[in-house]
C-alpha cells in the first residue's frame, strides 16, 4: 500500500561494502504497483550484487521477467520455502524487503479489489486472511534467521506501530518482535501515509 522501501535507501551507505550480502524481495512488483523490483535491483547493482525477487504468483514473475533486469533472479515460490533454502546459496542477506501476502484493510466489508485478490489467492491454494498474512511473514523471518547478515536491513510493508494498543499491526506485526529478539532495532515506523517499518542490525 505504501512505499516504505524507498526510505530504506538512506541507510544503504551504512552497509560495509566489503562484506555486503545479497538483496532479497519477497513479493515482486506487479502490474500497476509501486515498482519496487527495478528500484531495489538498482540498489543491488550499486554494490555489484544480485536481487532475488520471489513471488508465489507466476503472473507476477512473468511481469518482472519482461523488465529484463540483468542482475535479478526471479523465483516462483513462496517466500517461506525460498528462505528455508537460501543459506545453501552461501550468501548472507543484507537487504530483505517483505511485501507479500496482501493485507485486508477492511475485513468486515472488503473492497471489490480485495475480493478479487482473495479469489486469486484461492486459485493459488492460499486463504487470504490477515492472520494468514502474519503467519506467513513470521514464517519467512524465522526461515531467514540464519541467512540474515550481521549488518542487515529488513523492510516491512503494510506494518506499523499501533500507538493505541502498543504493538505492531499489519503484515509483519508478528515478525517484528522476533526480529527485535535477534538484535534488530526499529529505525523508523509510520502509519499513514506509508504504512511501513524499517529495522536494522549493525546499522547506525
Language-model segments: which ranges?
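A short alpha-helical cap/connector motif
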Residues: 1-204
Amino acid at each position: 500500500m505504501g512505499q516504505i522501501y524507498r526510505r530504506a535507501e538512506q541507510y544503504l551507505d551504512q552497509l560495509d561494502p566489503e562484506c555486503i550480502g545479497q538483496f532479497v524481495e519477497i513479493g515482486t512488483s506487479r502490474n500497476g504497483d509501486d515498482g519496487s523490483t527495478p528500484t531495489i535491483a538498482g540498489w543491488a547493482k550499486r554494490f555489484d550484487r544480485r536481487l532475488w525477487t520471489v513471488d508465489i504468483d507466476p503472473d507476477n514473475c512473468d511481469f518482472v521477467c519482461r523488465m529484463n533486469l540483468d542482475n535479478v533472479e526471479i523465483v516462483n515460490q513462496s517466500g517461506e520455502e525460498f528462505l528455508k533454502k537460501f543459506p545453501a546459496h552461501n550468501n548472507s542477506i543484507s537487504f530483505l524487503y517483505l511485501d507479500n501476502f496482501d493485507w485486508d484493510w477492511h475485513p468486515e466489508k472488503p473492497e471489490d479489489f480485495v475480493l478479487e485478490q482473495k479469489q486469486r489467492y484461492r486459485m493459488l491454494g492460499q486463504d487470504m486472511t490477515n492472520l494468514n498474512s502474519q503467519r506467513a511473514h513470521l514464517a519467512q523471518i524465522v526461515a531467514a534467521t540464519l541467512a540474515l547478515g550481521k549488518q542487515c536491513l529488513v523492510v516491512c510493508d503494510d506494518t506499523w506501530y499501533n500507538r493505541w494498543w502498543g504493538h505492531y499491526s499489519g503484515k509483519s506485526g508478528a515478525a517484528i518482535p522476533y526480529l527485535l529478539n535477534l538484535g534488530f532495532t526499529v529505525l523508523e515506523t509510520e502509519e499513514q501515509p506509508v504504512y511501513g517499518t524499517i529495522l536494522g542490525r549493525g546499522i547506525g
